[in-house]
UniProtKB/Swiss-Prot annotation:
Its EC number is 6.5.1.1. GO terms for biological process: cell division; DNA biosynthetic process; DNA recombination; DNA repair; lagging strand elongation. Coiled coil: none annotated. Keywords: ATP-binding, Cell cycle, Cell division, DNA damage, DNA recombination, DNA repair, DNA replication, Ligase, Magnesium, Metal-binding, Nucleotide-binding. This is DNA ligase 2. One of its GO terms (molecular function) is DNA binding. It comes from the Archaea. InterPro entries: ATP-dep_DNA_ligase, DNA_ligae_ATP-dep_bac/arc, DNA_ligase_ATP-dep, DNA_ligase_ATP-dep_C, DNA_ligase_ATP-dep_cent, DNA_ligase_ATP-dep_CS, DNA_ligase_ATP-dep_N, DNA_ligase_N_sf. It comes from Korarchaeum cryptofilum (strain OPF8). DNA ligase that seals nicks in double-stranded DNA during DNA replication, DNA recombination and DNA repair. Gene3D superfamilies: DNA ligase, ATP-dependent, N-terminal domain (1.10.3260.10), DNA ligase/mRNA capping enzyme (3.30.470.30), Nucleic acid-binding proteins (2.40.50.140).
Length: 594
């Protein structure tokens, strides 16, 4: 197939304003393409040379392209640079340059689609020393045999500026028209695309085998499935009304979505929410997840969070991103170790599970997942009709450092690529920050792990209630200490240690060690949230709930303060209410803006 036939259709597509017309042109293009190269045509039409999840970038800069154009046409680069602004588009420039040269030569070879495609693949894959020169030579090679119109599109494709406005969905429409008897199988085609988003391969299969070909498309290890997404509602009550009384309420971890493919021999590939291959920066995840599903082939849907290695607490999302940026992987693995929570199973040992109910998928997932310290099953609760229970679980989830809940319909199938109502998220809506530190009393401690073995990993902190003359817990604090402070801590607190909870402390939490409430520390958190466990503010803001400080950090000891000078319960309640007002204002503001 000659590239000029494709270029002519691109020219028509470029000129059209009607979507149906565009689909028609594409349909004709696809029908006139030999099936065995239809994948190549589809990738090129989308301005690419592979499925987008492969992340292969042509990425040829304009400067480099002008060098190639100059080499191919004999027109000096300065001259091209002069002409470029007048034409305003790299494609038009290439067309102009090649037409000037074409006037003087007659012996050019016809360019085939295969040759253009293979050359572009080589351009994309050229790396290392001499890669730039090689790219220039490769591009110049096809440009010297190109007709002006061909040069226009080659220029735009290599510089990633094709902009025909053809998207995956348009290609699916055209494929339906061309090979699947119009619209009858359009939905099925899209479902297949959602589980196998390599649109070139799909095109080839339906061109070669028609409707029967559709059935051959299945979940395949190494090809990412488009993830199912969640809707959002504002309250537990609304959610229960929407889904029905029986639900799965799952922690909504604030980390990175990971679709993890594991082969029988332990090989692993990890895909992000946007289907990028993120296997490389997560050697730890590869290891512990493959161990947890040893002997099986699986596709797991998971969320991976960074944790504080010393306390096991979940850290905010940003900390995980160090993996991709600031730190080297090795160092990030130590400073920000991860835990992966699996919440769905899409494929097991050759069997596609998408059409099974969540109830059943979960059962199978539980059976095959041999949990270890780092590869865990999502924390969830099955709730039947009790809105209050759902609210409480939400508060618990927030207190544990998550964003809230994803509530799911146990009877639902896995809808790849769809934001449906069988998954609904309930997020904490506070956006305000806690800007003022508080002074809290140490009433207990928990032994540390890892680097903190032998000292405390976290302290149990309480606010003071002058009316009742008691201390009520408001957070577990495990961050913000220097190594020296940590090392000194057992000794520093030794004098206050007792073997039971002090009678003036009101707590629902069992600590490893208890103290007489004396030592005061300054603490800064991210915000104050409702809590099903902490006793500060209990029943005073909401029935059966207290208040907790989220992500508390140690700012220093307040040796100038005694326990009665600590921040009071009433002050914490006030801060919580203030914060709510700020949120309401911000929410109205953003609603007005929307
Ligand atoms: N138990 C869970 N089930 C499903 N998704 C979860 C779960 N825990 C955490 N998540 C994360 O929450 C997201 C679900 O929300 P949604 O589908 O709306 O994604 P989003 O558009 O990225 O939104 P958000 O910004 O709220 O994460 C998932 O993409 C996933 O990364």
């Amino acid at each position: 197939m000659n590239f000029i036939d494709v270029a002519k259709i691109y020219e028509k597509i470029e000129a059209t304003t009607g979507r149906l017309e565009m689909i028609d042109y594409l349909k004709n293009l696809f029908l006139s393409t030999p099936p065995e190269i239809l994948d190549k045509i589809v990738y090129l039409t989308l301005g690419n040379i592979a499925a987008s999840f492969e992340g292969i970038e042509l990425g040829v800069g304009e400067k480099l392209f002008l060098r190639a154009l100059s080499l191919a046409t004999g027109i000096p680069q300065e001259r091209l640079e002069e002409e470029y602004p007048k034409l305003g588009d790299i494609g038009k420039l290439a067309e102009w340059a090649v037409s000037k040269k074409a006037a003087q030569s007659f012996f050019t070879e016809d360019l085939t689609v295969e040759r253009v495609f293979d050359t572009l693949s080589k351009v994309a894959r050229a790396t290392g020393e001499g890669a730039q020169d090689l790219k220039v030579r490769l591009i110049a090679g096809i440009l010297s045999d190109a007709k002006p119109l061909e040069a226009r599109y080659i220029a735009r494709i290599v510089t990633e500026k094709l902009r025909l406005g053809v998207r995956d969905m348009t290609v699916l429409d055209a494929l339906s028209e061309a090979f699947l008897k119009g619209r009858a199988y359009r939905d099925k085609l899209e479902r297949k695309y959602n589980i196998y988003p390599d649109i070139g391969k799909i095109a080839k299969v339906v061109a070669e085998k028609g409707i029967k070909g559709l059935d051959e498309i299945t979940i395949t290890l190494g090809i990412p499935v488009r993830p199912m997404l969640a809707q959002r509602l504002r309250s537990a009550e609304e959610i229960m009304e929407k889904i029905g009384p029986r639900i799965f309420a799952e922690f909504k971890y604030d980390g990175e979505r990971m679709q993890i493919h594991v082969w029988k021999d332990g090989k692993v590939k990890i895909f992000s929410r946007r289907l990028e291959d993120i296997t490389e920066p997560y050697p730890d995840v590869r290891e512990y997840v493959s161990k947890a599903v040893e002997g099986h082939e699986v596709v797991l849907d998971c969320e991976t969070v960074a944790i504080n290695p010393d306390t096991g607490e979940i850290l905010p999302f940003q900390e995980l991103m160090h993996r991709r940026r600031k730190y080297g992987v090795e160092e990030a693995m130590k400073t920000y170790p991860t835990v992966t929570y699996a919440f769905d199973l899409l494929y097991l040992d050759g069997r596609e599970l998408l059409d099974e109910q969540l109830d059943d998928r979960r059962k199978i997932l539980k059976e095959i997942l041999k949990e270890n310290e780092k590869a865990r099953l999502v924390q969830y609760e099955e709730i039947d009709g009790n809105v209050e229970e759902l609210e409480r679980f939400f508060e618990h989830a927030v207190e544990m450092g998550t964003e809230g809940l994803v509530v799911k319909d146990p009877k639902s199938i896995y809808q790849a690529g769809v934001r449906g109502w069988s998954w609904i998220k309930l997020k904490r809506s506070y956006i305000s920050k806690m800007i003022e530190p508080v002074d809290l009393v140490v009433v207990g401690a928990f032994w540390g792990k890892g680097k903190r073995a032998g000292t405390y990993g976290a302290l149990l902190m309480a606010a003071y209630s002058p009316e009742e003359d008691v201390f009520k817990t408001v957070c577990k604090m495990g961050s913000g200490f220097t190594d020296e402070e940590l090392a000194r801590m057992p000794k520093l607190l030794e004098d206050y240690k007792i073997d039971h909870k002090h009678p003036s402390v009101i707590s629902n939490i069992e600590a490893d060690v208890y103290f007489v409430p004396v030592k005061v520390a300054q603490v800064l958190g991210d915000e104050i949230t409702l809590s099903p466990t902490h006793t500060c503010g209990w029943n005073k803001v909401r029935k059966n709930a207290g208040l907790a400080i989220r992500f508390p950090r140690f700012m220093g000891w307040r040796d100038d303060k005694g326990p009665q000078d600590a921040t009071t319960e009433e002050e914490i309640i006030e801060m919580y209410k203030e914060q709510l007002k700020v949120v309401e204002v911000e929410e109205t503001k953003s609603e007005e803006e929307a």
